[in-house]
C-alpha cells in the first residue's frame, strides 16, 4: 500500500520554496531574452537592440513591483497599463511570458532532479529523446492487435490551468500574479487563440514556453490518474483504492464521481482489464494500444470522454479517438507512418522420406516517412511549390554563397537525421533533390543567371555537399569503416525537439 501511496501523493519536496521574488530579478528576463533569440533553422536572423531590450526589462520590473498596477476594478480595468501600449507590445509580452516560464520551470526542475536521484537514473538525457519512443514501439507493438489514436482535447479554461498548477507550485503569490498575467495577456494580445469563455488553445504552433508548461501540468494531472487506473487494472480487488479517492476528493472533483468510483471500483477495473496495454504520448497526441478485443479500447474511449468532461470541464468528441487494427491501418505519429505487416515465407521441411512446405508469416514493424506532408512542409518554408517543384529562396539571396549552401545543407542533414529510422529512403532522396535544386536556383537568382549557366560557369563542385553518399548524412564518414555496410534503421538519443519541417501532423 505504501508503494501506491507514494505514487499518488502530492510531492512535498521543497514546499516552502518561494518563487515570487524571482519574478522581479532582471537576470531572469535576460535569460528569457536569450531564449527568444533562439530561432529554428528555417527562420531568418532576428535583429535586436540590447540597450532598448534592457530598458524594457527594467520598465516591466518597475511596473510589476508597483501594487496599484495589480489592483483591477470594473471602472479602471480598461486603463490598466501592466502590459502597456507600446510599439514593442508583442516583444514585451513574449519576454514576460518567457520570464514567467523560467521561474515556473525552477520548481519542476527541482522535482525532476530529486526524482532522478531517488530512482538512481544516470543517463536521463537519453529518455528525453523523441527517437527513444520508436524502439519502444518496435519491441512491444509486434504483439498488439489494436491501437487508439487519441487527440487530447483543448482549449482549456485559464482557471483550470492555474488550479492544476497550484498542486505543484506552492507559492500562492506567484500563482496570483500568474493568474493576473494570463487574463491580461489574453485580453491585450492576439497571441492566444481565445474563446468567449476565456479558454486558450495551447497545442497550436507558435505558442510560448509558459503555456507549454501550463499545458504539460494539465497533462501530468490527467495522466497521473489515468495511468494509475491502467496499472491497477491487472490487480483487481487485491489493491485498495482509498488513495485514489482521497486525491480525487482533494482536487475538488465531482462528489458523485467519487461515490461511483468508491462503490464500483473493482468492477470498473475488471471492465478495463487487459493482459498487455501500452500508453505513449507526445505533445497533444497519445496512443493506447492493446492485444485484446476492440471492445476493450471502446470502453477506454468513452471512459476518457467522461473523464475529461468531469475533471477538466472539457468536452471531447468521441470522433477524436480513432481505434484501428495495426495489421490493416497505419499509425501517423511524430512524422512517421507505423504499421505491423505480415511477411509471408515458405519453409521446406523433410521428415524421413516425406517432405512438405509450410507457410509461415512473420510480423514486422514497418516505419516509413509520408512524402506528401513533408513536401507540404517544404512548400510552406518556400523551398518548393505544392506539387514539389523546387523554387528559389529570395530571402536568402543577399547572403554569401557559402552561407546559403551551408544553410541548405544543414536543413538537409537535420531532416535526414530525424528520419533516419525510415524503412524506405526514397522520400528522403526526393527531399534532397528539392533542397539541392532550390539552393542552385537561389544562387543563380543572386548572380542574375540561370541554373544551367551558373553551374556550368562555377562547376558542379559548388554543390558537392549535396552530392555525397546519402548514408554520410546519417553516419559520419570517420565514425566507422563499416558504415557503408549498414542499411537498417537508426534511432538517435539526442533529438529533443521537432522543427517545422518534420512537425507536419
UniProtKB/Swiss-Prot annotation:
Cellular component annotations (GO), alphabetically ordered: chloroplast
Membrane-spanning intervals of the chain: none
Gene Ontology biological-process entries: mRNA processing; RNA splicing; tRNA processing
Matching Pfam families: Intron_maturas2, MatK_N
InterPro entries, per the entry: Domain_X (IPR024937), Maturase_MatK (IPR002866), Maturase_MatK_N (IPR024942)
GO MF entry, a single one: RNA binding
Highest taxon listed in the record's lineage: Eukaryota
Subcellular localization, as worded in the UniProt entry: Plastid, Chloroplast
Keyword annotations of the record: Chloroplast, mRNA processing, Plastid, RNA-binding, tRNA processing
KW Secreted (keyword) present: no
Free-text function comment from the UniProt entry: Usually encoded in the trnK tRNA gene intron. Probably assists in splicing its own and other chloroplast group II introns.
Similarity annotation: Belongs to the intron maturase 2 family. MatK subfamily.
Protein's UniProt name: Maturase K
Organism classification: Eukaryota, Viridiplantae, Streptophyta, Embryophyta, Tracheophyta
